[in-house]
């Protein structure tokens, strides 16, 4: 995972798929607008670091096809699953494959219909038998903030619906407990910072780029309340909105 994180070119994901307001992500995954956000190392391509992580994992040489191999001559390869019904996700997967294979990691693309995709990537739809090796995931605003927040439901292997990353690590679970037990914003922020540090160290999931949501409203009104899930059209807006 660490080798992959350094082998990808995030500038290209931002420019090919992002808007004019997109930016390169950090290793802590969650963007700066998130409650409890902590600055972590920016993601950027570093092929020397990626190669060193490959060597540390026992893949120091390449075969005639340009793929890293271990001492037994087995090439480094994994299957990348994506939802064929989401055109952008297929594009992400294709660019990941192109970049990683240029680096020396073989990627087999597995494009599935929505039901088959869910059955390989979700605890609920796989009956707690997730079988994918890696996947292009779509995150919702609600999912990012659900339960303990910071996309943790997608990482936590014990989550009854999501849990795609299948993480059961004790340190990770202890951090989630601290977030859930926080009684003040300060306590939550401290625990959230620990989770982002954990993400950065272990890279269970990798953000390809960060982008912005642009909300349009009538110029005749101001003091809208912005909600991450419902945008401007949310209950709190009706208590804050004023006419100019």
Task: Locate the predicted segments by residue.
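Feature representing long, continuous alpha-helical segments
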Residues: 94, 98, 134-137, 144, ...
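Short, solvent-exposed loop/beta-turn-alpha elements that line the ligand-binding surface or hinge
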Residues: 35-52, 62-76, 122-130, 148-181, ...
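Bilobed periplasmic-binding protein-like "clamshell/Venus-flytrap" ligand-binding domains
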Residues: 15-17, 57-83, 128-135, 182-218
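Sec-exported extracytoplasmic/periplasmic mature domains
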Residues: 5-23, 35, 55-60, 98-105, ...
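Conserved structured core elements
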Residues: 7, 11, 24, 44, ...
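Append "and occasionally in soluble cytosolic enzymes with long acidic Gly/Pro-rich linkers
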Residues: 1-98, 194, 243
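Periplasmic binding protein-like
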Residues: 101-155
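Short, flexible loop/turn elements at secondary-structure junctions
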Residues: 8, 34, 82-84, 111-114, ...
